[in-house]
A protein has these predicted regions:
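Conserved hydrophobic/aromatic beta-strand scaffold that supports enzyme active sites
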Residues: 31, 39-41, 151-153
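Core catalytic region of metal-dependent phosphoesterases/phosphodiesterases
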Residues: 1-28, 100
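Catalytic metal-binding/acid-base residues of hydrolase active sites
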Residues: 15-18, 45, 80, 121-125, ...
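A short C-terminal boundary segment appended to hydrolase-like catalytic domains
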Residues: 157-214
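Active-site-proximal beta-strand elements of phosphoester/diester hydrolases
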Residues: 36-46, 74-76, 137-142, 164-168
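His/acidic metal-ligating clusters that form di-metal
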Residues: 40, 49-137, 187-211
Length: 214
């Protein structure tokens, strides 16, 4: 992808990178400014572990970034958050550990220009609104490698940011994608694809909603 995107390509580690102690893209925090928004990229990987964490340093950095920018902020990390309404409270939770997820929710609840949090890891499409985070959306995006073979595109507008779901198109890649659809006794397809509302949607600028409510 480097040949296509050049210095616009930003990497964040996942759990498979951390298993072998790779330092590739080992950047705890990255700030990327684009027209109309700021991208806050967090390394949630834990050395040799499948699940993720967010440090106090990263939380403080995110809060400071949100306090000094007047744009919408999209937050990216590999691991998805723990959902207090759905997930058992365990430190070996598959995504970001519960206490760290709660620290992230607290920043979202205070900083309304944090528009949403975007993750991979689960290889599925899912969107959750977390009450403890002020109702902000926490999103998981399916992977390129397996069904449905997808990437997410983000379009920045005044008043919100739109997620557009895009599938791979090369015939050979599609053939492989259809093979992986049958994993887990045929249940993987429905798990990974998610609902239409999990794939294409608008994340509203939460500052506008707060102003109306006030």
């Amino acid at each position: 992808y480097g040949s296509a995107f050049g210095d616009r390509l930003v990497h964040v580690r996942g759990n498979h990178d951390s298993y072998h102690g790779h330092v590739f893209a080992d950047f705890p925090m990255q700030e990327v400014v684009v027209e109309g928004a700021t991208l806050a990229v967090l390394d949630t990987a834990r050395l040799g572990q499948v699940n993720g964490s967010i440090s106090a340093e990263q939380i403080d950095w995110l809060a400071e970034l949100a306090s000094r920018t007047d744009t919408q902020v999209l937050v990216f990390g590999h691991h998805h958050v723990w959902n207090p309404e759905l997930d058992p409270r365990r430190d070996d939770f598959f995504g970001i550990r519960p206490a760290d997820s709660e620290a992230l929710f607290e920043v979202f609840a205070r900083r309304h220009n944090l528009t949403g949090y975007l993750a991979g890891h689960t290889h599925r499409n899912r969107r959750m609104h977390i009450a403890e985070a002020g109702g902000a959306p926490f999103v998981e995006v399916a992977c390129v490698k397996d069904f449905p073979g997808a990437v997410a595109e983000y379009r920045i507008h005044d008043g919100g940011i739109v997620q557009v779901f895009r599938r791979i198109s090369e015939p050979e890649a599609l053939r492989w994608s259809e093979r992986t659809r049958q994993m887990y006794e045929g249940g993987y397809g429905a798990y990974a694809f998610g609902r239409l509302a999990d794939r294409c949607f608008t994340m509203a600028d939460r500052r506008a909603r707060t102003a109306v409510a006030t």
